[in-house]
Amino acid sequence: MDNEEVNEECMRLFFKNARAHLDKHLTSRLTCDENAYITFRCFLDGIHRKSTRFLEELLLKQENMYHNNNYERINDSVIPLVLKLLWLQIHEPTLQWFEHWFHDIMRLSNRRKFRVFRIFQKKMIQFFKITHRYYYDIIEHLCAKYDMNSVISNALFAKLNLMQYTDGLSTHEKIILNTSNPLTFSIVISLQRCVINLGSTHFYKTLLNKPSNKPKSVEGFEKSIRYLNIASLYLPAVGDTYFQRAKIYLITGKFSLYFFELVRGALVRIPSKCALNNLKDFILTPDFPERRRLMKKLAILVSKDLKGEKSFFEGQIVLQFLSIVEHTLVPQSWNASRASNCWLLKEHLQMAALKYHSGNINVILENLAATMGSFDLMFTTRKSKEQKNKLKYADLSERQVFFLDLSFDFIANIIDVVIKPSWQKNMEDFRYLAIIRLLMCWIKSYRSILQYTHRHRKFCTSFALLLNDLINSPLNCSGNIYSHRPKRSYLFREDIIFREFSCINFALTDFNDDYVYDSPDMINNIIGCPTLTKVLSPKEECVLRIRSIIFSGMKFLEKNDTGVIWNASKYKFDLISPNIKIKRQIALSEISSKINVKTQQERVVSSRKVEAKRDEQQRKRAGKIAVTELEKQFANVRRTKKLSPLPEKDGVSSELVKHAASRGRKTITGPLSSDFLSYPDEAIDADEDITVQVPDTPT
């Protein structure tokens, strides 16, 4: 085959035909006929050789274009597409066929079960090793051929045992990947796709490794999670990584983490359609299998009187929250027999959180992220993110305001009962203050939420009291308040967890991170593994978080309309009764020397200076490679269709209502077709010829 023949259409046709042949191989004969299995192995080897040839010819073709300065002809998406199609059309259907065979074996009598399982395990492990070796060979080939030191941290290569490829050939023997090289995007995406597929392959191996239906533990999926964590550090904007992790947490009954990973996978720069559809089903469809599984688990815990168990707390929190969101988004799906009083549900949720929160702060953080994601889903899905962010509070529908009422009542109680009494006793646990950082960045990302919270007295009061504690904490030197965002040299754990989260405009922005991104060590700084500066102790990181929250909080409360004012003489916020008309607000001059409060004219001038400085910073960074730049480019390449917005009715997508009524019972392992066109798949367009269908398994 000539180089010119290797294109997207050619590859799609090849894998479509290969899939048809695969379905003929995956029959009951494969389970008992050794010759049939040998034939299947030969077929698989042929597919791998053909796929490798595709990759080699495409790489050579694009390298020639690069050397000839013919950059405009380089196709960024075609090489990652080979790996995506190979997984969707060959490897994943085969692993799903093994999964169906496994479930058939579990229904056999014990004596026959173990005999058949030995046959099954031998063939499954053989397929696993072949698949695993294939993806690792591609990774090693790419690392041996390209110098990625400007793109990917050596810490990530070390996690993959690939350090020999970073120190081997001299620079002139490799093609250097950086911002100016148009090959960078394609190679980095391909590398990440291989790592995701390795994680997914280990998921199936662990799932099918023992002849038992006993519940699986998260620890058993350690290797799968390790690969997926590495993939999310490579490119956190790719939603498929989070969806694959969600599958693990579903299997192990970690519903809070399952919910959280679905939100992350659905609301990133390059979202996963499977994550989005499963998220909507989990929220809006009471009969969705995962909802029923959660109910069954809770019933077992209650029957065993294990209400104090952490798993009971997680399940109860998730279920109560799902009920609130469902009631808010699709109220017509409720009736009197299902406790239609949503405020009662809210009270149950708050009681559960406040009673069992000790040692479960991670569930609170995950629930906050789920709250953000649920609010995002309440908008017409064809409305752009920019439009959502610019909507005013007055433009919100009654349902959206109702949801915010429930959410911020709950958040205020969390601040009062969980964060305020406990953060000083748990300084080494980053999640207490991370909740506040995440909350403030969410509020300032939406104009409507910012205006709403400025009017929410309970929230402003709780937040002001927390700020008083932070300002007067021994960790805040001399009770300082700050006129600028604090600086740091690397991203903290919560920054890494929530990178590319669309609900906060893709990053926590309450620090001045110029040094993080302008440093020669940027690729290590953004994954929290700096090599040119020391890693701070938990206490030192806590001090910086306090400064960040104080700065953000002072700016936020400056415009509140709930009677919370700054008392400069006492150095704290005072709470004024809403029944007393305030004739004199505190003079801005009293605190202008302490915090960055300006007149309207000063704000305009300052804003222009900030924008000019930001443009200058971006120009300075033009010569450096930033992973986010690759992610933006990838998103733009794949969004091939522009969609016209539809009118919004009552602020909630009418499609959500249809979705709740029409969704069938689907499992998380199946690729769910999307009814929401504004969330394209992160790597390929949704064509019928790549739908994963599992062939029949033996009875």
From Swiss-Prot:
UniProt keywords, alphabetically: Chromosome, DNA-binding, Nucleus, Telomere
Transmembrane segments: none
UniProt lineage: Eukaryota, Fungi, Dikarya, Ascomycota, Saccharomycotina
GO CC entries: chromosome, telomeric region; nucleolus; nucleus; telomerase holoenzyme complex
Top-rank taxon: Eukaryota
Biased composition regions of type Basic and acidic residues, renumbered to the chain: 647-658
UniProt main location, coarse: nucleus
GO annotation terms (biological process): G-quadruplex DNA formation; nuclear-transcribed mRNA catabolic process, nonsense-mediated decay; regulation of telomere maintenance via telomerase; telomere maintenance; telomere maintenance via telomerase
Protein name per UniProt: Telomere elongation protein EST1
Keyword Transit peptide: no
